[in-house]
Amino acid sequence: MQCPYCNADDTKVIDSRLAAEGAQVRRRRQCNQCQERFTTFEVVEVVMPRIIKSNGRIEPYDSQKLKRSIQLPLQKRPVTLDEQEAMISRIEKRIRQLGEREISSKGLGEVVMSELKELDDVAYVRFASVYRDFQDIEAFRQELQNIRPVDEQ
């Protein structure tokens, strides 16, 4: 690691500790040339799979696009921003755990739908109506039947 004070390449680690609840490693380093000390943080680089669109085009994963796509169906629903952020984290974790370099937009949509279904039924139906391109009231009825079986109605 290069020293930020004298730019020497010869530094040594004098202390290492976990930080940010185990998501980072904090290291105290000392330059062997100027003896200055400095702190570095080490984190895992997370690489998300690319998204294969329905037209075959491949795009990089965009967390902001995912966030926007779930904010719309959640408008005016009793879901906090913390709950939304937690859901986005779960979605991203599930996608990473697939271990694939690419995922179809359809596969991503299914993961989003399963998370929305757990979080808020109304938001789930709103998202499903756009994602599955409902054309008539019967499509809504079918989806509602999937959420709430006949014996619960």
Curated annotation (Swiss-Prot):
The ATP-cone domain extends over: 49-139
Cofactor(s) in the UniProt record = Zn(2+)
What highest taxon heads this organism's lineage? Bacteria
GO BP annotations of the record are: negative regulation of DNA-templated transcription
Q: What is this protein called?
A: Transcriptional repressor NrdR
Origin species, per record, is Psychrobacter sp. (strain PRwf-1)
Instruction: State what this protein does.
Output: Negatively regulates transcription of bacterial ribonucleotide reductase nrd genes and operons by binding to NrdR-boxes.
**Keywords, sorted A to Z:** ATP-binding, DNA-binding, Metal-binding, Nucleotide-binding, Repressor, Transcription, Transcription regulation, Zinc, Zinc-finger
Copy out the cofactor comment.
Binds 1 zinc ion.
| Residue spans, zinc finger unnamed | 3-34
* Classification via InterPro entries: ATP-cone_dom (IPR005144), NrdR-like_N (IPR055173), RNR_NrdR-like (IPR003796)
Question: Under the GO molecular function aspect, what terms does this record hold?
Answer: ATP binding; DNA binding; zinc ion binding
Which NCBIfam families does this chain map to? transcriptional regulator NrdR
Pfam families xref list: ATP-cone, Zn_ribbon_NrdR
Q: Which HAMAP family match?
A: NrdR
